[in-house]
């Protein structure tokens, strides 16, 4: 097990790990326990009661965070002609087709999201093994395979995030920065939680949201009441 820093251990002493905090309490405490001198990212981890090995229990989706992530995502677009021009006008960080594919094959991965027009997907498939494991492969289900590249770029730049359950039935996503107001962090959390609840597979049995923790990148995970899905801005325990 990795040795924890003194700053982390001091921060962890402020957390009662036997308690389930309200989302607002957790947001406040996450900011207080950040051991980073930078504007730390606030993250959420959710354990779901699903079996990701079963195709009908794969949970994935997208959500537009009302207050963004605090970071402007770097977006690339696979497109040609008029659609390429639209993507550039929308603010895409890189636009291309074969040239962009070759660049990625050469090891370039300095971007956070990839969009493709439908006609380019056959070509993009050649780098699926590179993009897929990193969660960067364009997919119609996440709105990243589309002819409306202007909207797709704007959505991602504006705070649209993707979530996908991993092999251990966990979801990880960002809800903002430590500099955000507590209420904005909670409202972002609420928007993501609503979408996760809507994505519940009909075949999932038992408790769906089993565990939730909120933390900054360098801080301890703060346990959140997984049953608290309404009145999230209330400070009191559920």
From Swiss-Prot:
Keyword rRNA-binding carried by entry? yes
Q: Per UniProt, which keywords does this protein have?
A: Repressor, Ribonucleoprotein, Ribosomal protein, RNA-binding, rRNA-binding, Translation regulation, tRNA-binding
Q: Give the UniProt record's GO annotations in the biological process aspect.
A: regulation of translation; translation
Q: Does the keyword Repressor apply?
A: yes
One MF term in the entry's GO annotations: rRNA binding
Task: Return the Basic and acidic residues bias intervals.
Answer: 227-238
User: What GO CC terms are in its UniProt record?
Assistant: large ribosomal subunit
Cysteines joined through disulfide linkages: none
Q: Which InterPro entries match?
A: Ribosom_uL1_bac-type, Ribosomal_uL1, Ribosomal_uL1-like, Ribosomal_uL1/biogenesis, Ribosomal_uL1_3-a/b-sand, Ribosomal_uL1_CS
Region Disordered, as annotated, extends over 219-238
Instruction: List, alphabetically, the Gene3D superfamilies matched.
Output: 3.30.190.20, 3.40.50.790
Function statement:
Binds directly to 23S rRNA. The L1 stalk is quite mobile in the ribosome, and is involved in E site tRNA release. Protein L1 is also a translational repressor protein, it controls the translation of the L11 operon by binding to its mRNA.
HAMAP family the record matches: Ribosomal_uL1_B
Q: Subunit info?
A: Part of the 50S ribosomal subunit.
Give the family, as the similarity comment puts it. Belongs to the universal ribosomal protein uL1 family.
Protein name, UniProt field: Large ribosomal subunit protein uL1
Species name for this entry? Rhodococcus opacus (strain B4)
GN (gene name): rplA
């Amino acid at each position: 097990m990795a040795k924890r820093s003194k700053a982390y251990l001091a921060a962890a002493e402020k957390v009662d790990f036997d308690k389930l905090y309200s989302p607002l309490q957790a947001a406040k405490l996450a900011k207080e326990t950040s051991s980073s001198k930078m504007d730390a990212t606030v993250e959420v981890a959710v354990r779901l009661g699903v079996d990701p090995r079963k195709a009908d229990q794969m949970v994935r989706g997208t959500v537009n965070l009302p207050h963004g992530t605090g970071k402007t995502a770097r977006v690339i677009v696979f497109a040609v002609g008029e659609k390429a021009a639209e993507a550039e006008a929308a603010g895409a960080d890189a636009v291309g087709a074969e040239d962009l594919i070759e660049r990625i094959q050469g090891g370039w991965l300095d971007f956070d999201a990839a969009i493709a027009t439908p006609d380019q997907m056959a070509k993009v498939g050649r780098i699926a093994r590179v993009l897929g494991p990193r969660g960067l492969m364009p997919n119609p289900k996440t709105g990243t395979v589309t002819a409306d590249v202007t909207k797709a770029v704007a959505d991602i730049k504006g705070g649209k995030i993707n979530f996908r359950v991993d092999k251990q039935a966990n979801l990880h996503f960002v809800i903002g920065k430590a500099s955000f107001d507590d209420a904005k962090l909670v409202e972002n959390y609420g928007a993501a939680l609503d979408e996760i609840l809507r994505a519940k597979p009909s075949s999932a049995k038992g408790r769906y949201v089993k565990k939730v923790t909120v933390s900054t990148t360098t801080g301890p995970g703060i346990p959140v009441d997984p049953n608290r899905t309404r009145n999230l801005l209330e400070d009191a325990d559920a």
